[in-house]
Design a protein with these regions (language model features):
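Cytoplasmic loop-to-transmembrane helix junctions
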Residues: 4-7, 37, 95-102
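Transmembrane alpha-helices of Major Facilitator/SLC transporters
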Residues: 5-29
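A late C-terminal transmembrane helix in Major Facilitator Superfamily
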Residues: 20, 88-125
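Cytoplasmic membrane-interface "Motif A"-like loop-to-helix N-cap segments
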Residues: 28-45
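A membrane-interface helix-boundary motif in multi-pass transporters
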Residues: 37-40, 119-137
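Multi-pass alpha-helical transporter architecture, strongest
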Residues: 52-58, 133-157
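Hydrophobic core of transmembrane alpha-helices in multi-pass small-molecule transporters
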Residues: 62-78
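Intracellular juxtamembrane helix-capping segments at the cytosolic ends
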Residues: 78-91
Length: 157
């Protein structure tokens, strides 16, 4: 554990930074050609977390775990870099603080629920399968994002 903590933290932090930069650049360019470019960019990021969760769940080697961390970090970075820009496509400036606060709080509640689930799966000896099952939830979120998020403008006034 003395090695696992720093290695996983550095891997995810570095790859998230890469994802944020790549996701921001891609999104800013894509939205100039397609109004849903930010949504698609966020979907790509979210999509990268699916194989990461599968690798975390079923990977049994150091390389698999590092690969999962890299995929998750890049994917989450791409996804996270686009949350506020996507929000701006749907919510006017006068309500963005409230909307972003609600969005963040929803994430905190979801994180708390997932932490509780992971604890139960750990106690039951099925943490790996639990991580893999989380990929199903991510796939559902990805499908919902692609189906429902249809912006009409890049910046709602």
């Amino acid at each position: 554990m003395a090695e696992a903590g720093p290695i996983s933290t550095i891997t995810i932090a570095f790859s998230s930074f890469v994802g944020v930069i790549l996701g921001g650049i891609l999104s800013d360019r894509w939205v100039q050609k397609n109004i849903r470019g930010r949504v698609y960019t966020g979907a790509i990021g979210l999509g990268l977390t699916v194989p990461a969760l599968m690798l975390l769940g079923f990977g049994s080697s150091f390389v698999a775990v590092i690969g999962a961390g890299l995929l998750f970090g890049i994917g989450f970075g791409i996804f996270d870099a686009n949350n506020m820009p996507i929000l701006c496509q749907f919510v006017s400036a006068k309500h963005r603080g409230t909307a972003y606060g609600i969005m963040n709080m929803t994430g905190v509640f979801a994180g708390a629920a997932v932490t509780q689930l992971l604890g139960k799966w750990t106690d039951g000896g099925s943490l790996g399968e639990g991580f893999a099952m989380l990929s199903i939830i991510v796939l559902i979120a990805l499908a919902l994002q692609l189906y429902f998020l249809r912006p009409k403008t890049d910046n709602m006034e």
